[in-house]
Amino acid sequence: MSGASSSEQNNNSYETKTPNLRMSEKKCSWASYMTNSPTLIVMIGLPARGKTYVSKKLTRYLNWIGVPTKVFNLGVYRREAVKSYKSYDFFRHDNEEAMKIRKQCALVALEDVKAYLTEENGQIAVFDATNTTRERRDMILNFAEQNSFKVFFVESVCDDPDVIAANILEVKVSSPDYPERNRENVMEDFLKRIECYKVTYRPLDPDNYDKDLSFIKVINVGQRFLVNRVQDYIQSKIVYYLMNIHVQPRTIYLCRHGESEFNLLGKIGGDSGLSVRGKQFAQALRKFLEEQEITDLKVWTSQLKRTIQTAESLGVPYEQWKILNEIDAGVCEEMTYAEIEKRYPEEFALRDQEKYLYRYPGGESYQDLVQRLEPVIMELERQGNVLVISHQAVMRCLLAYFLDKGADELPYLRCPLHTIFKLTPVAYGCKVETIKLNVEAVNTHRDKPTNNFPKNQTPVRMRRNSFTPLSSSNTIRRPRNYSVGSRPLKPLSPLRAQDMQEGAD
């Protein structure tokens, strides 16, 4: 462990008693935001084409990588305006009264979009509606131009009757539009609703009318894509993400390595091997997988000894990913929490104050880890059945993506040793099963502290990382108050909680 040099201490007279662990850090080149102006993502497509599925999944991904994003589903606004849905007649293009109501709902939703992007620190809004007419899309473009929003269209095109029928039965039967209705009646009414939309549907025209717009067409659930005039970095990320996801049934298994020697000693980080109980877990994991009879299962590990030893016992091929390595604790590697608190009391307190943003001196933060793990998420979205054997912090980040957890919850998600999380993607989320393999292990979980700072203790300076925090419904924007080589500003007060949907329109 090395502290700051004497010259560094002399240059920082306000901190002469404690080594400055952070002066050697380089500034990160990432900007504070990933967008240079607010973006409105506009869904397009007939009902039962997966628009809400894409909207929710894309929003979950963007929030996870740190771009505050929110879905505005027009069906929710319509159901607020019209409390009882009677039949497909409401969606006929010659139903003038209904057309007025639907247009008014769209205008109200767009006003909420404006408030979110201009007043609530939002960066991306997803307008989840059919938007099948050129008139509607032109109205949205005019709205965006007036408010200086970028627009990116996502059109979902599907002509496979089996996919459409499956979507109706899986999602629409449970829609608020159809309380207490049987499947046959729902299918009949919804197919007639689709026919109503087909009368006025004008797909995006990349060769003429819409050639200057930015958009992606997703054809038959990802069989083909058409991309047109991508404007910026965030739009390219959206395109890349949409080209990697699929809807085929699969299961993702997440677990930590077996208990390690350092786990027994209470030490963090390092590269120790498995304990006796850790090896027992590896054998129990092998038996579990054999009983499951999982087809074409891929196994991924980190490059650390404890995950590799766990995978070796399975008797199957596995792939090692360096980016699955545990969070880098920097100068605190191979120390216990008690040792960290004694040797670096301010660092210990700072991490308790804001665990997601806190970066170990010479190491990583959870925020850094999310960025590092993005390729893993992309690859998981492309794959079928996968078992990921990783580490506590890594598993928390992966779980936060699949379970749509925010920055406040992520660092405190419970990921006990010798426990498997079975994740099964469903229509608008992810089903989770927790399976304990009945092999004892130490508890490595630390609960969130209730009081970060005693009243008689000087609050520790908050240190913001260089790019946007993982977004959540309680998005908090705090100014940077410490840069390398400059005197910190006055300490921040403890963070307080901020007060901060689906279907066809």
Curated annotation (Swiss-Prot):
Residues given in the record as beta-D-fructose 6-phosphate binding sites: 78, 102, 130, 136, 172, 193, 197
Catalytic residues, chain numbering: 128, 158, 257, 326
A GO term, aspect molecular function: protein kinase binding
Keyword vocabulary terms for this entry: Acetylation, ATP-binding, Hydrolase, Kinase, Multifunctional enzyme, Nucleotide-binding, Phosphoprotein, Transferase
GO (cellular component) term, any one: nucleoplasm
Residue stretches of biased makeup (Polar residues): 450-476
Region listing for 6-phosphofructo-2-kinase, in residue ranges: 2-248
GO biological process: fructose 2,6-bisphosphate metabolic process; fructose metabolic process; glucose catabolic process; glycolytic process; lactate metabolic process; positive regulation of insulin secretion; response to glucose
TM ranges: none
UniProt cross-references to PANTHER family, sorted A to Z: 6-PHOSPHOFRUCTO-2-KINASE/FRUCTOSE-2,6-BISPHOSPHATASE, 6-PHOSPHOFRUCTO-2-KINASE_FRUCTOSE-2,6-BISPHOSPHATASE 2
Protein name in UniProt: 6-phosphofructo-2-kinase/fructose-2,6-bisphosphatase 2
Lineage: Eukaryota, Metazoa, Chordata, Craniata, Vertebrata
Gene, per the UniProt record: PFKFB2
